[in-house]
């Protein structure tokens, strides 16, 4: 039952991606991206619905050509979550998805083409209240910056970003967010730190091409954790070569660990040892699978023995500490003794009861407020 996060977030301009606020005092938004063929409308809608069920706030969809733009329009009509269209090179695609109701455009003004084309995209965005995301990536820096710096560097990433920022600002457009991504953690962190001092717009955080589920999770947690702990970042995307739903889960787990945002169960569990009185690993696996549907923020401690068990259990909404018999704590107080028989079923029941109680209490506070 930990309190608010001690992190003081960087002040930034608030923009709106559909119904989702980004920046300012808004919660840090969790994003993901579809990896289906955009032209396969049914598959893409199904994936977006799965992402929404997992708690995603914003979904990015690649729109490589005009056929995909038309498919994007059909997808937009079939989902509720705000959609970002990822567009490169052809400004006409951006203009078309703007007509079709896109919630945000992800572009680089530098690869859209001539000034008149950039102006046309910006005018369309302004007229429809559509924000733009400037996305700079170490793998696709401008040739002159590659020549100037010799290789991708934090300074090169920021110089590229500021070029695009100035481009939009010359056109009197301020509703944008910026990312400066790299697959190298130190490069990305340094670039975001530099950029955070230069602009007031919200920052979209990510470690690009982070890797598979395990390695990508670790790299993203390290890199984004460093920045978020410093108050930098308004929206995050965990880039994984895995099911996009896993990106959402990892994103929320990172935010939970820093007490920046809560959704669902925050498990505190020991790695287990020979002192355990029940199978901690098996118990955790079963509970995580069974309780994925719960959205109410709860701290649940699952500790296998009495060394650290009582201390952790007392700090959680519900805690289980191993013993003979095992002991359940509710709101920091011993409440019930349990044997290993039916342990998971009983613990699930208690957690669901506590979640319902907390949801009702939270709703009551909102109504009274």
From Swiss-Prot:
Q: Which cofactor does it need?
A: [4Fe-4S] cluster
Enzyme Commission number(s) from the entry: 1.17.7.3
| Xref: InterPro entries | Dihydropteroate_synth-like_sf, IspG_bac, IspG_bac-typ, NO2/SO3_Rdtase_4Fe4S_sf
Q: Pfam families, per this entry?
A: GcpE
The answer, when asked if Disulfide bond is one of the entry's keywords, is no
Q: What catalytic activity does the UniProt entry give for this protein?
A: (2E)-4-hydroxy-3-methylbut-2-enyl diphosphate + oxidized [flavodoxin] + H2O + 2 H(+) = 2-C-methyl-D-erythritol 2,4-cyclic diphosphate + reduced [flavodoxin]
Can you tell me which residues bind [4Fe-4S] cluster? 270, 273, 305, 312
Keyword field contains Repeat? no
The annotation note on the cofactor reads:
Binds 1 [4Fe-4S] cluster.
Keywords, A to Z, come to: 4Fe-4S, Iron, Iron-sulfur, Isoprene biosynthesis, Metal-binding, Oxidoreductase
Top-rank EC class of the record's enzyme:
oxidoreductase
Record HAMAP family? IspG (MF_00159)
Q: Which PANTHER family match?
A: 4-HYDROXY-3-METHYLBUT-2-EN-1-YL DIPHOSPHATE SYNTHASE, 4-HYDROXY-3-METHYLBUT-2-EN-1-YL DIPHOSPHATE SYNTHASE (FERREDOXIN), CHLOROPLASTIC
Would you tell me the protein name for this molecule? 4-hydroxy-3-methylbut-2-en-1-yl diphosphate synthase (flavodoxin)
Organism of origin is Pseudomonas syringae pv. syringae (strain B728a)
